[in-house]
């Protein structure tokens, strides 16, 4: 018995052979999310399927994906035509309705029955030594067969007596009861609430002692705080950009250590030397080949050689910068390990992080950074678009950074006598709103004062902390869910024979581009292989 007639549930039913299969669907019809996916065109897979495109346990994801590639899925939907578009996505030429039609047709060909309008309330496993539960199970018999089982191979009374410890009882909200030897939970996540999203899968998992990672909206836009309210004046404006944000920290060996810290000399030295994790506007700092030498940079504006040295005293780092052996302007701002600091400040060093006052620090481990390119779309609520939706998957309630001009050099503006809104490769409406929010007028770049230019350079590294997301109503997916540590490689629950979880209900979420549908199909394929072998 399968709870949920969505992508995972239907694909599983379509690939089971010689089984008595029933699907319970909460909605009045199956596959509502499928019909809404890809803007109604249903992007079923991606040529570049890889675990790196998912948030979740990489080992589990790799194992699920290894036996089903994009060609297998296209073959399954062989009678349909798919157009491969940018970023290797495959959209159905005739629309999502036909994709759902193939899934329903194949499931029914395999003998599956779909019961719609059935809202599951709870699940329990009947144990042989619980006489009252056995009596309840027997009372549900019609002749010598269980209700909820379909087909000639439904378990007879003799088999029921022998295998009562393997039977699940599924109770619907209207009081109906269904019984199954194998129970598959494919109920999805909490996204698209208007399409009948439910948390029943999480409740079932918890009732069996399985950990559920708190679900949160994913592939969703960001709302903004007061400083970014100017975004709302740009509703409808869309253009390519690049977003940089942190992934959750990795729990593996030296990965938790700073990539920017390296000791020079012996272990008792009082001086630490630093490399810098990324190129910054105006200066490209890099570690000398001599590990004991301080950092140097060619300043793009003054062509001076800038030297950075750091000394540790009582757990603090004092930064000293010089240009051609003369003290550097103390008000000049630099970036070290992606944390903004002032050259004259003392900055606390704590576990691989640089802290600037009470501002949140960006971790110095570049391995935990995610860089996402794509369109950004401004809305009346904040900011959305493919790049933002993908960024929301990895967002950890903190800062994000947007480069609004990823393929533009400020030197081009420096050489031009045209107004900035004309020179920049951005919608003029956006540039004017950005300048207005910064208290600047539109004029040639050369006519801005140095302090004003610093504001303009934020276009290349605009950092802000979103207020939140648009929520589950607007989310295309759910991150969080049933902890995959509780599952075997084929999605069976460890220690609970006959119980399985597949698809979006799991703590695995893919980026935009057909990755989530592919993962749902791949889970179902892995489980079908196990069940067909029984």
What are these regions (language model features)?
Residues 17-39:
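Glycine-rich FAD pyrophosphate-binding loop
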Residues 182-228:
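Glycine-rich loop(s) and the adjacent beta-strand/alpha-helix scaffold that form part
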Residues 1-23:
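N-terminal Rossmann-like FAD-binding beta1-loop-alpha1 element of flavoenzymes
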Residues 3, 178-191, 376-379:
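Short hydrophobic core segments
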Residues 28-30, 35-36, 44-50, 211-214, ...:
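An anion/pyrophosphate-binding glycine-rich loop and adjacent beta-alpha core
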Residues 39-86:
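Glycine-rich active-site loop/strand segments that organize a redox cofactor
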Residues 67-148, 155-182:
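Feature captures the FAD/FMN-dependent oxidoreductase FAD-binding
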Residues 116, 436-509:
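A glycine-rich dinucleotide-binding beta-alpha-beta segment and adjacent secondary-structure elements
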